[in-house]
């Protein structure tokens, strides 16, 4: 769903909910909009930096401060949320054995404690450690590609297996990885039109700051000599 936005629209909670579930809406409508809007982050100016926005179900890879790749991902469910915050990319394991965590063993209740490498392994062809090993988090492939993107993992960040292999070969161990929760993005396109994307709230944080959005939009409009409908 796309529609022209106004400050009045941003003030109405019911209207904002419609926008959230519409996923993408346009401000100062143009025929050309970016397919994926970029979150409001300050990536590392040198080296690589991974940014995962839970609400977008997207992984953004930056090289020397510039966006180089966007991948769709599946993230943790509301009951098994992916840990927000600052992490580091850790060790990589190709053709990993899945040693099933006890919590998942209990959930499965089939007596299986591990799954060998192969087409039936939920980790896919590669597992990249995300953060402290004590968190048991990783960025990995999958044997269920239709589940990506989505909000359905036990906390790990799931990628389609070809993407996971590409990512693993590209990313350097020790690179910073930021897991964020931004419910809206504002980006300017090549035609100097401003686009707003608003996302679902899978962890029910209710932290969409419409006042900050209004302030940012007003500042942009003033800088570009444009008028926002009241």
Where would I find each of the regions flagged by the language model?
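Sec-dependent N-terminal signal peptides
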Residues: 19-28
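N-terminal signal peptide c-region/cleavage motif recognized by signal peptidases
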Residues: 29-33
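Short beta-strand-centered segments at strand-helix junctions
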Residues: 153-170
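Loop/turn positions that initiate beta-strands
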Residues: 174-177
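Short, charged beta-turn/beta-strand-edge "cap" motif at the junction between a beta-strand
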Residues: 80, 182-186
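Gly/Pro-biased beta-strand-loop elements
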Residues: 35-147, 166-170, 194-230
């Amino acid at each position: 769903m796309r529609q022209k936005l106004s400050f009045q629209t941003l003030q109405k909670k019911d209207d904002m909910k419609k926008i959230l579930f519409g996923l993408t809406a346009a401000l100062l409508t143009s025929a050309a909009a970016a397919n994926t809007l970029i979150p409001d982050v300050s990536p590392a100016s040198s080296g690589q930096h991974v940014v995962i926005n839970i609400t977008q179900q997207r992984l953004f890879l930056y090289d020397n401060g510039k966006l180089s790749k966007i991948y769709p991902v599946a993230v943790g469910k509301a009951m098994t949320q992916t840990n927000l915050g600052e992490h580091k990319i850790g060790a990589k394991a190709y053709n990993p054995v899945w040693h099933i965590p006890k919590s998942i063993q209990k959930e499965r209740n089939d007596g299986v404690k591990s799954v060998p490498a192969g087409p039936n392994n939920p980790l896919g062809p590669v597992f990249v450690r995300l953060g402290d090993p004590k968190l048991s988090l990783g960025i990995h492939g999958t044997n269920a590609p239709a589940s990506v993107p989505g909000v359905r993992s036990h906390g790990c960040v799931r990628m389609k297996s070809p993407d996971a292999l590409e990512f693993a070969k590209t990313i350097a161990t020790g690179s910073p990885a930021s897991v964020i929760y931004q419910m809206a993005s504002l980006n300017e396109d090549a035609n100097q039109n401003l686009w707003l994307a608003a996302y679902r709230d899978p962890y029910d944080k209710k932290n969409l700051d419409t006042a900050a959005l209004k302030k940012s939009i007003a500042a942009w409009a003033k800088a570009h000599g444009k008028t926002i409908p009241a």
